Amino acid sequence: MEVVNAIGRRKAAVARVFVSEGTGKITINKRELEKYFPSSILQFIVKQPLAKLNVAEQYDIKINLDGGGFKGQSEAARLAISRALIKINPEDKAVLRAEGFVTRDPRAVERKKPGRPKARKRFQFSKR
């Protein structure tokens, strides 16, 4: 099997994933998963598609993460891994879609509007 790559985005985060046959090693920006995401919840989010398909020990995954915060980066990585696994085996798409791993979450920060302190907040109104 050659290297399969995919891209995932979430908020301001972009994840580029390279999946190859291996022993289940996940590397993010040249660091181990446990070093990059010390939080077990974020590690779990990244591993979710692999765990759902029971292929965690079959592939080595190299991830380049860019922008955003920890949560956005972990969810971008999850989407990219899901897309790469679908490229490898298209029959897995239904299982991953049922779990919601294939859908790109479009929610992002709403822009600040002129004449207001934030996107929706108004300056204090004085009646008199």
Curated annotation (Swiss-Prot):
It comes from the Bacteria. Residues 107-128 are annotated as: Disordered. GO terms for cellular component: cytosolic small ribosomal subunit. SUPFAM superfamilies: Ribosomal protein S5 domain 2-like. It holds the Pfam family Ribosomal_S9. GO terms for molecular function: RNA binding; structural constituent of ribosome. Keywords: Ribonucleoprotein, Ribosomal protein. Residues 113-128 have a biased composition (Basic residues). GO terms for biological process: translation. The keyword Ribosomal protein applies. PROSITE patterns: RIBOSOMAL_S9. The keyword Ribonucleoprotein applies. Belongs to the universal ribosomal protein uS9 family. This is Small ribosomal subunit protein uS9. It comes from Parabacteroides distasonis (strain ATCC 8503 / DSM 20701 / CIP 104284 / JCM 5825 / NCTC 11152). The gene is rpsI.
